[in-house]
Amino acid sequence: MSQTSLSERPPVPAYLAESRTYRWAYGGRFSPFFLDHAWVVEAILWGQGRRLMRLAAAEVAPGEIVLQPACVYGAFSRHLLGAIGAEGRLDVIDVLPGQVDNLRRKLAGRANVQIELGDAEDVPAQAYDVVSCFFLLHEVPQAKRRAIVAALLGAVRPGGRVVFVDYHRPRWWHPLGPLMALVHRTLEPFAASLWDQRLAELDAAGEFSWRTETYFGGLYQKTVATRQD
């Protein structure tokens, strides 16, 4: 992945720039200082953070070339690096300079990772064995989500996988269902639309096989799209 020059830097999307919640959570100067801690991630994900990271990393094999769109708080990148081993490579992109700088500090000294400014909608075609998209889709508007999914599907080689770990509609009996619906309406305005979004429907060309597993009473999903050889 080539270095991003100042002239090539992607603009910060309007949905990020205009949202007070997103500006505070991701774009603030001190956002990582307050939020980039394992206990914070576990609290936000109701104790399921490490489990979901392991489930995503389980889809990656040693020596593979992996793209991670969005920097992600917590130890997710380390899970992927552990899965690919010394012979693999991890590319990470994010549209926010502060997030890029923070992850570079966290992973300083790792030789097989590149972290650059970039938009998940603009990635190279068929360049990766795996794309691992961890809790990004619920944070973007539906039109942007469709564009991101299309780009990420296009980024894997024949036989490659795109792994989406994100929110899912919880079972009707889930005690946290009403609370999460309220949180998504008030703090994460694009998340609710993901509850009823079958990601396989975004595979317009039908070039992928799909499987979905849900966890924690259906609140979370891992959906894996595999490009046909």
Where in the sequence are the language-model features?
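N-terminal, positively charged/glycine-rich alpha-helical extensions of SAM-dependent methyltransferases
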Residues: 1-36
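Conserved alpha-helix/loop element of class I SAM-dependent methyltransferases that forms part
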Residues: 43-62, 75, 79
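Helix-to-beta-strand junctions that scaffold the AdoMet/dcAdoMet cofactor pocket
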Residues: 61, 85, 140-141, 156-158
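Class I SAM-dependent methyltransferase SAM/SAH-binding core
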Residues: 67-121
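A short acidic, Gly/Pro-enriched loop at the edge of an enzyme's catalytic core
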Residues: 121-131
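A short SAM/SAH-binding and catalytic strip from SAM-dependent methyltransferases
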Residues: 130-143
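A short glycine-rich, Lys/Arg-flanked "PGG" loop and its adjoining helix->strand segment in the class I
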Residues: 146-158
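C-terminal alpha-helical "lid/dimerization" subdomain adjacent to the S-adenosyl-L-methionine
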Residues: 163-206, 210-220
